[in-house]
Amino acid sequence: MSLEDTLANMSLYDAKKYFRKAQNVVFNYTEMEGKVREATNNEPWGASSTLMDQISQGTYNFREREEILSMIFRRFTEKAGSEWRQIYKALQLLDYLIKHGSERFIDDTRNSINLIRILETFHYIDSQGRDQGINVRTRVKALIELLSDDNKIRAERKKARETAKKYKGVAGGSASADGSLNSKAGFTSTKVHGISVSADFDSDNEDNEDGSFSQNGYNDNASRATSTPGQGKQEPEDFVDFFSSESSKPSKELIQEDEKKADEEEDDDDEFSEFQSAVPVTNPANSFNLLNTSPIEGMPATTSSMPFYNSSTTDQGKITPAIAEPKKVDPFSSLFSTAKASAEAPSAPKASQAKAAASNPVSNSTTALSTDQDDDDEFGEMHGGAVQQEQNTNNNHTSSKEIDLLSF
């Protein structure tokens, strides 16, 4: 077909269509704005449902939603009364998007409801004397009532989903193929809660969270599962069936690992239990000093139940007590010896008592230490020094009658 034939067969409406496309390029309109302009043209027929459905998909995108809403409001404010068809079509498109579009779009429309209220006083009388503004006023009144009632919005959106499901859900007994359109547009509620109450309660008693409808049994996920019957429910790889014979080997290995871990824990517990059960055995009958291994007088020398005492008691005769030191370097020993020699005759009874006391230093020290059995063994040398000092003072008193060493 030649260009002349194409121009000859072109109607006035086709010329307007190409002219609008040229305007979109000149004024740098986006694709979504061009679709809105196409749906709100000045033709005597309404926009197609396919075009309005494509526009409703754009309400789920933030940028396209702003473009759609701004272009619709421009139709309200920039058009004259003679272009009442474009205003009426813009109101019709807005009503469709509220019922089928995103819930965020409803919130944005409510924020700009004052621009819609301006059209409540719209008037236009054509050349034939007919008031064409009554159609616009009626549509504006119904739209404001819809935006003011949340329950009505939920009911209308539910009805729109059911209607769309009848005509779009299934064709020829099989699930429809996924097209370029958004499957969520007007059929399921979004997860984002907006300002409107309808956004918060749109899914109550209407559809489930997985996209299924509770009343009529429609489930988007179920239809996808039935379309591919070969793909059944796959079990995870780590799942082990303990009741089947095939999984006996891995189950035995798991049981052996658990038993091994339990044995290790029991071994750790046994070590601590042995440590706690080792209660020290005390023997009050024989209180041994680590530095003095000789038992207390009057008590029979019995071996202790502790193993380290047995090794020390075997050499009691060989070990000399650390408390009583028989030989010690004393600068005044010569003076004591001369004093004892001179006073040996008159003080024989006292000297004999002193010799008896000196001959048995262990008994004196043990009797003195019997009162301090609960003290620490580290201070045993201090007690021994005190006993030896008492012996020296006794010897000084015995010889004080003849010679006073302090008088020098």
From Swiss-Prot:
PANTHER family: CLATHRIN INTERACTOR 1, EPSIN/ENT-RELATED. Pfam families: ENTH. Gene3D superfamilies: 1.25.40.90. GO terms for cellular component: clathrin vesicle coat; cytosol; endosome; Golgi apparatus; plasma membrane. The gene is ENT3. This is Epsin-3. It comes from Saccharomyces cerevisiae (strain ATCC 204508 / S288c) (Baker's yeast). InterPro entries: ENTH, ENTH_VHS. GO terms for biological process: actin cytoskeleton organization; early endosome to Golgi transport; endocytosis; Golgi to endosome transport; late endosome to vacuole transport via multivesicular body sorting pathway; multivesicular body sorting pathway; protein transport. Residues 24-157 form the ENTH domain. Coiled coil: none annotated.
